[in-house]
Swiss-Prot record:
PANTHER family assigned: LYSINE--TRNA LIGASE, CHLOROPLASTIC_MITOCHONDRIAL, LYSYL-TRNA SYNTHETASE
Record protein name field: Lysine--tRNA ligase
Subcellular localization: Cytoplasm
Database matches in HAMAP family: Lys_tRNA_synth_class2
Native source organism of the sequence: Haemophilus ducreyi (strain 35000HP / ATCC 700724)
InterPro entries: Aa-tRNA-synt_II, aa-tRNA-synth_II, aa-tRNA-synth_II/BPL/LPL, Lys-tRNA-ligase_II, Lys-tRNA-ligase_II_bac/euk, Lys-tRNA-ligase_II_N, Lys-tRNA-synth_II_C, NA-bd_OB-fold
Cofactor binding note of this UniProt entry: Binds 3 Mg(2+) ions per subunit.
Positions that bind Mg(2+) 2: 416
Length: 498
């Protein structure tokens, strides 16, 4: 903000405080009770197309509230546009329609951003705009700071994220985005409840962070004198519940990962994670297709979902392709047999500019090659399958090829949206894979998993054949809201301290 802009702001704030002082002298400037009986959108939907004479004959009395977004003062009368949670409606406030002195002493002190309540009758102006002719008015909240420029809106991206309340006031698209977010969350919850899943809650603070390859946030519990971690995933606790006999469970909640911030990553994010006994990863891919198709129809009314330059088709069966096949398809001449040889795979990776870590085995190298040559090519909804066992420490090995797992990742628009697999329920194999993760961590991989002996003990009691999946809510909302950044779909995203 320039020095001149700051002086203008200070001057306007001073003027508003002077108005507030006058209002205080007349009574309470922040009354606590006004009972509306109508919302702007509902009034527009029912009466906007009604002829003026018919509307006059109907004599529709309303009580509405809202924030003043536009103001036109014309001597003894004024027009205001107010905005409530549903939309906007115009007010006509005339001195002669109000009690004596109210127009000058009350309405004359209103500013953009103030919140008012009015009672009146609906009518049409000469231009045909639905309007409330006000017979009684009340200031409910005095705004001491001005709104963003009414013509430009709130265009500064950083301010939109830091002061989300202003963004929501000024930008209809932002309000729409978070309505869509609410619909996505409630739609997912309803989808699983209708299919017999039980919603559960598992610890956010964990002594051993598990369930994903990620770097955790560390904290300390003073009373127990023990380091604890904000969870990176609820997976191991949810599978304990399946061991305990709850055959269908899900949790829709927050996870935390102490990693970078980007248009796709926020350190605090929301996921749905669910587990289904006596199902395999093919069943979960079917579930996912059904879920996304239903969300698209319920929220957008179509299975053709626009996103930037793309249009995703949720109406057709999603493509299913193995990691090796994807590399061969998009790898510009990479031979399948070279992906089965560690030396040749490393050579390919280095030619692609990949920095190969000493701790990587063949599976990790192949995964890095996939991320470099194929991941961004998976635009239409695609299930990537047959991940190397090395990078899938919790997934069941494939019966025909134990070097890969019965795992899938869902990609849309070149971005990972979900991850699922048939669960590893062999306790001895799980213990060995945890040991391999510990070795990788000791070798410098700070995203390798911790060993969770208690989880191995749970598996030793018997986990039935089970499949599980996690879906990123934020990235799903990005798709349905056509939002380019994850910050656009999180109400209060992580920001550098100002």
């Amino acid at each position: 903000m320039s020095e001149e802009q700051e002086l203008d702001l200070n001057g306007e704030m001073l003027a508003r405080r002077e108005k507030l002082a006058k209002i205080r002298a007349m009574g309470n400037p922040f009354p606590n009770r006004f009972r509306r009986d109508a919302y702007a959108y509902a009034l527009q939907a029912e009466y906007a197309e009604m002829a003026g004479d018919a509307l006059k004959d109907a004599d529709v009395q309303v009580k509405v509230v809202g924030r003043i977004m536009l103001k036109r003062v014309m001597g003894k009368a004024s027009f205001f546009t107010i905005q409530d949670v549903s939309g906007q409606i115009q007010l006509y406030v005339a001195r002669d329609n109000l009690a004596e002195g109210v127009y000058v002493d009350n309405v004359g002190l209103w500013d953009l951003g103030d919140i008012v309540g009015v009672c009146g009758t609906l009518f049409k102006t000469k231009t045909g705009e639905l309007t409330v002719r006000c017979a009684d008015v009340e200031l409910l909240t005095k705004s001491l700071r001005p709104l963003p420029n009414k013509h430009q809106g709130l265009v500064d991206q950083e301010m939109r994220y830091r002061q989300r309340y202003l963004d929501l006031i000024a930008n209809e698209q932002s309000r729409r985005t978070f309505v869509i977010r609410s619909q996505v969350v409630s739609g997912i919850r309803q989808f699983f409840l209708e299919r017999g899943f039980m919603e559960v809650e598992t610890p956010m603070l964990q002594v051993i962070p598990g369930g994903a390859a990620a770097k955790p946030f560390v904290t300390h519990h003073n009373a127990l004198d023990v380091d604890m971690y904000l969870r990176i995933a609820p997976e191991l606790y949810l599978k304990r519940l399946v061991v305990g006999g709850f055959e269908r469970v899900f949790e829709l909640n927050r996870n935390f990962r102490n990693e970078g911030v980007s248009v796709r990553h926020n350190p605090e994010f929301t996921m749905i994670e669910y587990y289904q006994a006596y199902a395999d990863y093919h069943d979960l891919m079917d579930n996912t297709e059904q879920l996304l198709r239903k969300l698209a129809l319920d929220i957008l009314g179509t299975t053709a979902v626009p996103y930037g330059e793309y249009q995703f088709d949720f109406g057709q069966p999603f493509e299913r392709i193995t990691m090796h096949d994807a590399i061969v398809k998009y790898g510009n001449g990479i031979a399948r047999e070279d992906l089965d040889d560690i030396e040749k795979a490393v050579e390919i990776a280095k030619k692609l500019g990949i920095e190969v870590q000493k701790s990587w085995g063949l599976g990790a190298v192949v995964n890095a090659i996939f991320e470099e040559v194929a991941e961004h090519q998976l635009i239409q909804p695609t299930f990537l399958m047959a991940h190397p066992a090395e990078i899938s420490p919790l997934a069941r090995r494939n019966d025909e090829n134990p070097e890969v797992t019965d795992r899938f990742e869902l990609f849309i628009g070149g971005r990972e949206i979900g991850n699922g697999f048939s669960e590893l329920n062999d306790a001895e194999d799980q213990a060995a894979r945890f040991d391999a993760q510990v070795a990788a961590k000791d070798a410098g991989d700070d995203e390798a998993m911790f060993k969770d002996d208690d989880f191995v003990v749970a598996l030793e009691h018997g986990l039935p054949p089970t499949a599980g999946e996690g879906l990123g809510i934020d990235r799903l909302v990005m798709i349905f809201a056509n939002a380019p950044s994850i910050r656009d779909v999180i109400l209060f995203p992580a920001m550098r301290h100002k």
